[in-house]
Amino acid sequence: MFNKFNTKPLWEVSKTLSSVAQGFEPADMVIINSRLINVCTREVIENTDVAISCGRIALVGDAKHCIGESTEVIDAKGQYIAPGFLDGHIHVESSMLSVSEYARSVVPHGTVGIYMDPHEICNVLGLNGVRYMIEDGKGTPLKNMVTTPSCVPAVPGFEDTGAAVGPEDVRETMKWDEIVGLGEMMNFPGILYSTDHAHGVVGETLKASKTVTGHYSLPETGKGLNGYIASGVRCCHESTRAEDALAKMRLGMYTMFREGSAWHDLKEVSKAITGNKVDSRFAVLISDDTHPHTLLKDGHLDHIIKRAIEEGIEPLTAIQMVTINCAQCFQMDHELGSITPGKCADIVLIEDLKDVKITKVIIDGNLVAKDGVLTTSIAKYDYPENAMHSMHIRDKITPASFNIMAQNKEKVTARVIEIIPERVGTYERHIELNVKDDKVQCDPSKDVLKAVVFERHHETGKAGYGFVKGFGIKRGAMAATVAHDAHNLLVIGTNDEDMALAANTLIECGGGMVAVQDGKVLGLVPLPIAGLMSNKPLEEMAEMVEKLDSAWKEIGCDIVSPFMTMALIPLACLPELRLTNRGLVDCNKFEFVSLFVEE
């Protein structure tokens, strides 16, 4: 695969690199006195130099003969050097930051490349949204490697999205220079039941010899998992149990260990390696979804490496999991992922391996960050008008919009979605609720809130009604346009008045997240770019998110990253019960179910 993510292709500079390695020409940069973390052999090689030319590595070893008058020399002074870190699965939209601001935030932490699945913005704006994010990334040093969204909508027939992506669209995007594969194939039922659409988008990717990324959340690891992998899917980030992760690795599937803002899977899935003493070559560390306050407080892959080490994974193994393993997963290890001759000169200097403290970051042979601060400029991208005005709701939302009716009854037994804090799954519960004036009442005493999803893309007027449990809210309401994956307007709350205020607040600001109580807005994060992102800097976004978290606590919710958990309520490809703008979905059987249980 031709790498568009370096300043110059190898074939164009091969003569120069060979000459520099032999001392016939001086290097552009030489790193001296380093302790090389060799991810190819999983060892530390002392007193190693690295010569760099044309944005690539020319020599690893003694590089004194490569130094000329114009060569920039960086003395590592005994620090470790490692390949730049690669995040194998990330939705930038979940950071609420633009791509350029995201790059500014993560590069100083050693992240040199991301495999970005922009299926959030694609669900709102279609492939135009993907193009906008690609353009946004071009002004940054970060290597923005993009996978075409595979499931827009996530599960066809169960929700309304702003756009749809089919095999023909995938075929076209595989011609784009920035596309390296197919985004997570969430429609595993479509693969297992051999639908033309699911196999069509996978097939177009395989025809282009690019990587199909996966999403297999079922605990079944027998014939279903085998069939899924056999279709061409190469990796999966949805393992939450060690046995699932181990089963996938044993079948040659790159298994991505997730540690994000809300999903803390590493503690459990790391046992696949530490508890079984198996080869880790098919294991990758990823973030998936990370909020701005997490990036500001903890960092990015540097933090995830540290967490892996804390869970008992050897430091060199953890670094392999964000470098060569990831590059091999995407069939790009001939370009990325190791400090070896010919590869992209993407290098991080690490003061110590225990705390994974990054002191310098080099991308394509350029020093781009030092001591946690970006040392290069990043161009700001202005998103087009259609991206900035994405709220299209047909009917005016009032308190009456939240009525759930049950004629001539005093009580009903409702299907209720119970969330699992810090996990992506849900439980289906059957709970008795009171009816007053033919209107079903939520019951905060039982931790049961009302939930409504309004379609916001095409002014259809469709809305889905349900109940949720597990947030702990006693009084108030929350709303968000970050509601995976269709990103319709999701509102949950204890009373119709606060729910209407929450919904209308987001309509007025172009989307985002809000918490209200007693007719007052307690916390608001405006996200005007497709209702998903903002152009504001990380620090400002983190402050707003912290205030929103405080607002959540004020109204009674103390779970970790509650908006991320809330955002998965409509995601119909995850078990067990979900709510979309079309109604309640049994995600084990993939069929609509009634809100009320028949007695």
Swiss-Prot record:
UniProt KW keywords: Hydrolase, Manganese
Molecular-function GO terms, alphabetical: adenine deaminase activity
Catalysed reactions listed for this entry: adenine + H2O + H(+) = hypoxanthine + NH4(+)
GO biological process, one term: adenine catabolic process
Gene3D superfamilies from the UniProt entry: Metal-dependent hydrolases, Urease, subunit C, domain 1
Keyword Hydrolase assigned: yes
Top-level EC class: hydrolase
EC number: 3.5.4.2
Cofactors: Mn(2+)
PANTHER family referenced in this protein's UniProt entry, alphabetically: ADENINE DEAMINASE, N-ACETYLGLUCOSAMINE-6-PHOSPHATE DEACETYLASE
Protein family (similarity comment): Belongs to the metallo-dependent hydrolases superfamily. Adenine deaminase family.
Protein name as catalogued: Adenine deaminase
UniProt lineage: Bacteria, Bacillati, Bacillota, Clostridia, Eubacteriales
Gene that this polypeptide is encoded by: ade
